[in-house]
């Protein structure tokens, strides 16, 4: 399975450390950058792409909303914020989930699972087979056995 590259951006060093700890417990995640420095993320994203960004909303230099406006077409976001009042605005972007601080591993894991389910769905190709005179769409991930019958599968 392909690793999901991600960035952790929060102006609180303890929040960055907590999220780094949580990401290390999920095998599919690879942290490309974890920082409190917004400009380091901007520089990184000008030359690199990541799948997922864990981002705080209220930061001193550039807000999380401004960051999402800048990089919305390239990445998905999981917002980690102490303030619920930005939730509605944030869904104008590619936000997978809005997780309120303090963040438990359970809440974090649910948000990541939501992204993983979404990314698997988006990359899964459909398989069409003829059954009972019509075309039926199948998800290849749901096929466990195939039986051959003469010249047919």
Task: Locate the predicted segments by residue.
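Conserved RecA-like P-loop NTPase ATPase core
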Residues: 19, 87, 143
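Cofactor-binding loop segments of dinucleotide-utilizing enzymes, especially the Rossmann-like FAD-
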Residues: 11, 82, 148
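CheY-like receiver
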Residues: 14, 25, 38-122
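Two-component/phosphorelay signaling modules centered on CheY-like receiver
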Residues: 12-33, 70
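Non-catalytic signal-transmission and effector/linker regions of two-component phosphorelay proteins
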Residues: 1-5
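Conserved binding/recognition cores within well-folded domains
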Residues: 113-153
């Amino acid at each position: 399975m392909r690793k999901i590259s991600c960035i952790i951006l929060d102006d609180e060093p303890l929040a960055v450390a907590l999220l780094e700890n949580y990401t290390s417990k999920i095998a599919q995640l690879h942290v490309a950058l974890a920082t409190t420095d917004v400009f380091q993320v901007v520089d990184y994203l000008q030359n690199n792409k990541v799948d997922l960004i864990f981002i705080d909303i209220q930061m001193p230099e550039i807000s999380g909303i401004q960051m999402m406006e800048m990089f919305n077409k390239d990445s998905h976001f999981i917002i980690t914020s102490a303030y619920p009042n930005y939730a509605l605005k944030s869904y104008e972007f590619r936000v997978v989930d809005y997780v309120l601080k303090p963040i438990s591993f359970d809440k974090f894991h649910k948000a990541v699972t939501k992204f993983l389910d979404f990314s698997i769905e988006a990359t899964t190709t459909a398989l069409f087979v003829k059954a009972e005179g019509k075309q039926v769409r199948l998800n290849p991930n749901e096929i466990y056995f195939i039986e051959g019958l003469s010249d047919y599968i």
